[in-house]
């Protein structure tokens, strides 16, 4: 049994929150769930939990905010569907943000422990009873989509055309095969372990995509080595082989997953880790170019902010003594929303912030106005195999900085710089 599923004595309270699949998960094998608009939930792995609780202050801006621990239970409805429900956990030192104070989407419905009864499960209304009603409504909507995804999940790269006139964000949640796959696998693992226990500890983390209307997400596996010091010989050999057969060995980074909305063509593009492993260095560069391309032209205004954040992160990691971030990923996130176009003959003050798009790229009479489009995020995630001399129980203590991870960051900086220079910036 994996560390995330070891028996733990946890005591659920009287109220719980129904956890939903996190639709913007593009990589990793651990299931990530949506707790509320700004908070995600994933199985607690002791080493990752330890990392977040002892995180160096200067690294905090490059990792999701840690919000605490919850107890998660599951119920099976009459159709044998499993639903995961989170309960508050007494005694955790993290701060659980139970009320969404974000003003990014003030009109959105928020899940709380004590309000919104259509989302909160109270003791007098059994979870099973509530779940049956909820599932019955959702089943009719999702049945056809599930049938369509049987073949989509087998594809390493897929495109899906969306209705550009509709709400792209709402359509996006239906078409992420990797998210569906991880959610189904998580439920199956919990079902198989049901005889042993029905309660698990999950950690709560900041939802990095919550401030973006149409999140474009790139998941990069960083470093030249992926296996932890505690890996078995078989596991280590398997991870070494994956690195040797991918760009990890050559440039210290490989694509682990990608989700891009190309507003110009009205397509969603998904790429999974299996395709990422097959990419050559040139293929990796092309994938990065594709990530920053909206189907009509390159989003050049994103490249400068990305380079700045990568350089800042590199400087921070160069100061971290004895840390090794084995199998950790780096997320790059920006908004793929198509912003309104502004006519070139508009008033001067309207043109003040226009991007420098040429006439042929912007269909002649218009230039593209990326309002807030340069807002891009770069964060480290997944620390289940991180090690440091602060973790006294580790049998291996490393010296100096994580050269493999830093090498991958420098490669990334070089490639994004190359894309920027080739595009004429």
Swiss-Prot record:
Transferase keyword on record: yes
PANTHER family: INOSITOL HEXAKISPHOSPHATE KINASE 2, INOSITOL POLYPHOSPHATE KINASE
Pathway linked to the protein: Phospholipid metabolism; phosphatidylinositol metabolism
Gene3D superfamilies named among the record's database cross-references: Inositol polyphosphate kinase
Any one GO MF annotation of this record: inositol hexakisphosphate 5-kinase activity
Superkingdom of the organism of origin: Eukaryota
Positions contributing to ATP binding: 206-208, 219, 382
Protein name according to UniProt: Inositol hexakisphosphate kinase 2
The organism's taxonomic lineage, starting at the top: Eukaryota, Metazoa, Chordata, Craniata, Vertebrata
Binding site for substrate: 215-223, 235-242, 385
Tissue expression per record: Detected in kidney, intestine, liver and heart.
Record-listed E.C. numbers: 2.7.4.-
């Amino acid at each position: 049994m994996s560390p995330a599923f070891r028996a733990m004595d946890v005591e659920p309270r009287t109220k719980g929150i129904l956890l939903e699949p996190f639709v913007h998960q593009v990589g990793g094998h651990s299931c990530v769930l949506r707790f509320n608009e700004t908070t995600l939930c994933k199985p607690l792995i002791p080493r990752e939990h330890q990392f977040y609780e002892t995180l160096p202050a200067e690294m905090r801006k490059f990792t999701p905010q840690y919000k605490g621990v919850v107890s998660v239970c599951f119920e099976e409805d009459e159709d044998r569907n499993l639903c995961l429900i989170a309960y508050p956990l007494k005694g955790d030192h993290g701060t659980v943000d139970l009320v969404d104070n974000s003003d990014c989407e003030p009109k959105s419905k928020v899940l709380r422990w004590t309000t919104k009864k259509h989302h909160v499960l109270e003791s007098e209304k059994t979870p099973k009873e509530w779940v049956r009603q909820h599932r019955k409504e959702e089943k009719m909507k999702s049945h056809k989509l599930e049938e369509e995804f049987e073949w989509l999940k087998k594809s390493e790269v897929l495109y899906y055309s969306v209705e550009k006139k509709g709400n792209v964000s709402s359509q996006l949640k239906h078409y992420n095969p990797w998210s569906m796959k991880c959610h189904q696998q998580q439920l199956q693992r919990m079902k198989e372990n049901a005889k042993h226990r029905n309660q698990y500890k999950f950690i709560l983390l900041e939802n990095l995509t919550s401030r973006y209307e149409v999140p474009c997400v790139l998941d990069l596996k960083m470093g030249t080595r992926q296996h932890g010091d505690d890996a078995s010989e078989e596991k280590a050999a398997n991870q070494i082989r994956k690195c040797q057969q991918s760009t990890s060995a050559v440039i210290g980074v490989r694509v682990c997953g990608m989700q891009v909305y190309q507003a110009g063509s009205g397509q969603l593009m998904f790429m999974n880790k299996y395709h990422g492993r097959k990419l050559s260095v040139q293929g990796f560069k092309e994938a990065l170019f594709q990530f920053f391309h909206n189907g009509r032209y390159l989003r050049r205004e994103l490249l400068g902010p990305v380079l700045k954040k990568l350089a800042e992160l590199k400087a921070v990691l160069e100061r971290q003594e004895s840390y090794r971030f084995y199998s950790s990923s780096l997320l790059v996130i920006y908004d793929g929303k198509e912003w309104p176009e502004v006519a070139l003959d508009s008033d001067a003050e309207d043109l003040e912030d226009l991007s420098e798009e040429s006439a042929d790229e912007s269909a002649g009479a218009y230039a593209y106005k990326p309002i807030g489009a340069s807002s891009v995020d770069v964060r480290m995630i997944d620390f289940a195999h991180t090690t440091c001399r602060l973790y006294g129980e580790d049998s291996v203590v490393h010296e100096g900085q994580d050269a493999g991870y830093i090498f991958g960051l420098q490669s990334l900086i070089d490639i994004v710089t190359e894309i920027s220079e080739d595009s004429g910036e």
